Amino acid sequence: MQKKLFLIIPILFFLKINEIKVISYNIRYNNSNDGINIWENRRSTIKNFIVSENPDFAGLQEVTYSQLIFLTESLKDYDFIGVGRDDGKNKGEFSPIFYNKNKYKVLSNDTFWLSSTPEKVSIGWDASMERICTYGLFENIDTKKRLWIFNTHFDHIGNHAREKSTD
């Protein structure tokens, strides 16, 4: 029995070390017409959820610049990668990837538009608006293991755009 226990403990330790927690969360854009569900009434709940889940990575959708500022200031253990979809900078919704900066560092990152011209701001196929994919190569600070994380938000109207966005 002692030999079996001795073998189980290192295996469990190994499994815990290699665990990565990733969440995806559509936080809904900051819309003043949302009545009781306006951003000011949701933001603490969203921040608290992310803190309580303590993910290594959080791919968020429909994030406006003002929401991004709040989350960046509120989530002290996290930094993010991503750009606004309307100009490749700060305008329009972001699909940011928040990452635990105490555990991971960014080696490279970029954004592409879900369209036939992915390198520039563009609306794809029958989509109702610009759609983007944010991605990054991350390295675990302790283990030096690397991984790619991608985050996107497909169009809610264009069937063809949703299909082509998977290519």
PLM features: residue spans?
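A short acidic, helix-capping loop that chelates divalent metal ions and anchors anionic groups
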Residues: N30-D34, P118-V121, G158
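Active-site-proximal segments of metal-dependent phosphoesterases and phosphodiesterases across multiple
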Residues: F150-D167
